[in-house]
Design a protein with these regions (language model features):
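N-terminal intrinsically disordered/low-complexity leader segments
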Residues: 1-8, 193
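Amphipathic alpha-helical packing segments from all-alpha helical-bundle domains
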Residues: 68-74, 97-107, 115-142, 153, ...
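Helix-turn-helix
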Residues: 12, 16, 20-58
């Protein structure tokens, strides 16, 4: 009789894979390289992920999902100060060494999705999720929806660009100072209550 599948094994493997990939490229992903790095059989990956394409898709979903807790905050209920604190938490999370490593993987995945013509790719959709998140707060605070969407896009592009800057330049302080200013400009669009 076959052994019952362990529902915790796949998420555990994904966590180990993400840690392994922090200093590597998605292009290096194969069942063999991961099996060697993690000390398991290639069969384990075939069993849990099926094929390389599904494995990479699961990795990308896990990378993008790292921000789910931040994106589920009900920002429409926050005042300026609380929203500023929320955005400070966002920067804290994304600017850690792990956050920068995972953002680099997300950027790589988004570029691969672009080249493959995947308009609805998981990584490509990450920016839109952030734009909607920020626009929700602006709209809830009397900024007209069209204006809120544009302001949110400007802010999120700054967020992603500053993360890229911190990764490439290695100067997290400079990126943090610019992010703080971007938050102040965004929040100032909403009058004090």
């Amino acid at each position: 009789m076959p052994r019952k599948p362990d529902p915790t094994r796949k998420p555990e493997l994904l966590g180990q894979i993400l840690e392994h990939l922090r200093g590597r490229s998605l292009a290096t992903v194969s069942f063999r390289t991961l099996a060697e790095a993690l000390g398991v059989s290639t069969y384990v990956f075939v069993y849990h992920f099926g094929n390389r394409a599904e494995l990479v898709a699961e990795i990308v979903r896990a990378v993008v999902a790292r921000n789910d807790a931040l994106l589920t905050v009900a920002v429409s209920e926050l005042d300026r100060e609380a929203f500023s604190k929320h955005l400070a938490k966002v920067w804290h999370d994304v600017s850690t060494e792990r956050g920068r490593d995972l953002h680099r993987l997300e950027l790589e995945a988004a570029l691969l999705e672009t080249v493959a013509g995947e308009a609805d790719g998981t990584a490509r959709g990450a920016v839109g999720r952030w734009v909607d998140h920020v626009a929700d707060w602006l709209s809830a605070n009397a900024v007209p929806p069209a204006e809120a969407k544009v302001a949110a896009r400007v802010f999120v592009d700054a967020l992603f660009g500053l993360q890229y800057d911190a990764i490439v330049s290695g100067d997290g302080r400079r990126a943090s100072a610019a992010y703080k200013q971007a938050v102040e400009i965004l929040v100032s669009r909403v009058p004090q209550r």
